[in-house]
Amino acid sequence: MTEDVFEYSAAKMRKHGMTDMAIAQFRRLYEVWRNEEASSWIREDEVEPLVSVPSFHDVYETINHDKAVDAFAKTAFLKLNGGLGTSMGLDCAKSLLPVRRHKARQMRFIDIIIGQVLTARTRLGVDLPLTLMNSFRTSKDIMKVLQTNKKFHQEDIPMEIIQHQEPKISAETGMPVSFPANPELEWCPPGHGDLFSTIWESGLLDALEAQGFKYLFISNSDNLGARPSRTLAQHFENTGAPFMIEVAKRTPADRKGGHIVRDKVTGRLMLREMSQVHPDDKDDAQNIDKHPYFNTNSIWVRIDALKAKLASYDGVLPLPVIRNKKTVDPTDPTSEPVIQLETAMGAAVSLFDGATCVCVDRMRFLPVKTTDDLFIMRSDRFHLTDQYEMEDGNYIFPDVHLDARYYKNIHDFDARFPYGVPSLAAAKSVDIDGDWTFGRDVMLFSDARLEDQGEPSYVPNGEYVGPQGVEPDDWV
C-alpha cells in the first residue's frame, strides 16, 4: 500500500524533472515515515553524556601554527545557502539580507562570506574553494553576486550545487498535496541532511579530490561565526577522524534543542533531537549540566571517508527522519495540513567510527534565524573587522524580545529603525511591546523595556531606554 501511494509522489517528481537520486532519497524518507520507524526513541539509558571535549582554545595552544597552513591548504569550504528567510518575510535568499556596514558599504551575509574566503586566500596563500548549496529559489540571485564580484574567481571546483526538492505530503492521505493557488508551495526542501546525496550526485567530491583537497568544512550561511579556520583544519587532521562536529556549551536557552550523546553499545556519537527524546527522559535531556554540548551545525569531513560512506549506501545515507507538521501555505493556518519530511546533517555523525567533536566558543556560533537575532547582529555589540570577522567583546548577548506584530517582518523591522538599531552596549535584556519607531542615537541599558501604548509610538533622538521605558534625563 505504501509503495502504491508513494508512486504518485514519484510521478510528480519525474514530471518536474527531479533526478533518480532525489526520488530515491524521498522514497526512503517516505517509507520510514509510513512505517513509523521515525518515531523510535533514543532512550536515556541507551546513551552516555559527552564528556572531555577539547576546546578551541586548548587546540590553539597546542597545534603547530606553521603546519596548520598546510592542513588548511587541503581544505574546501561549503556553505548551506538554500534558505529564503521566509520567517522574516523575505522572498529571496536570506544571505542577501544586509547585516551591517563596512567602510561605508552595506554588507550582506553573502558579501561577508566572500570576504572571509578572499581574506583567507590572500593572507595564507591557499586556494580555499567556496561551494554554495543553493536551492532552485536562491541559485539565480546568488550566482549573480559571485559572478559579478571582480575579486572572486574559482576554476575546476563548482561554485554551487543545487539541493533537491520534494513534494509536501497530505497529512490525511499521504498523497502529494495540490495547491493551485500557488503551486510553488507544493514543494519543500528535504532538510540540510540532503547535502550528502546532493554532494554525491553533483560529483563535487571527485572534483575536490582531483585538485588535491582532503577535507571539507560545511556550515550554514546565516552563521557568520563559522568562518574558515586553519586552527581547526590542523586539529581535524591531527585527530585522523573521518567526521568532526563543532559543538558549544548549552545554556538555559538551549535546553530544548538537540544535543550530542554517545551510544553505549557502539560507542559512536549521536545527535539526539528533542523529537527523539521519550517523555520520561525529558528532564535528563534538558539537563544542561548532564548533557552540556549542542550541535552548531558546522562539520568537518574527510573527503575520502565521506565518499566511501556514500558509496556504501548508493548516495542515500540512512539518517533519522524528522517529520514536520505544517500547513501547505505556512502563512495560512486554515490551509491543508501537510507533512514535510527532513533529515539533519549532523545526524550523520552516528555513521562514522572514530567521529569526534571540538568545543567552540560562541564567536563561532552566531546564527541569525529571526529579526531578534538580526537586531543584535546590527547593533554596536559587533564590529566587522577588515578580516570580515564579526567581533564582540565577550559574545554574551542580551536576551531580546521584539513584538512580532511589528518587527517579525524585515520590511516592518527596517521601517521602525530608520537610523539603525539602538545601542546595546549597556543592555542586559530588551523587551519591546507594541509599535515603536526609534530615532537617532538611542541607547538601551539594563533591562530595557517599552510597553504597548495602544498606538504607534516614537523614541526621540538621543534618548535612553531602561527598565522604566524612556527615562527622564534626571534619572539617567
Regions found by a protein language model. Name each.
Residues M1-A76, Q234-V476:
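Left-handed beta-helix
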Residues M1-K79, S87-Y215, V421, A426, ...:
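Conserved N-terminal catalytic core of the sugar/cofactor nucleotidyltransferase
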Residues L78, L97, T131, E160-I162, ...:
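Hydrophobic/aromatic beta-strand patches that form the interior of the parallel beta-sheet core
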Residues G89, A93, R101-A104, S229, ...:
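Short capping/connector residues at structural and topological boundaries
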Residues D127, D141-Y313:
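Conserved core of the sugar-phosphate nucleotidyltransferase
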Residues P129-T138, S221-N223, R362-L366:
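Conserved short loop/turn motifs at secondary-structure junctions
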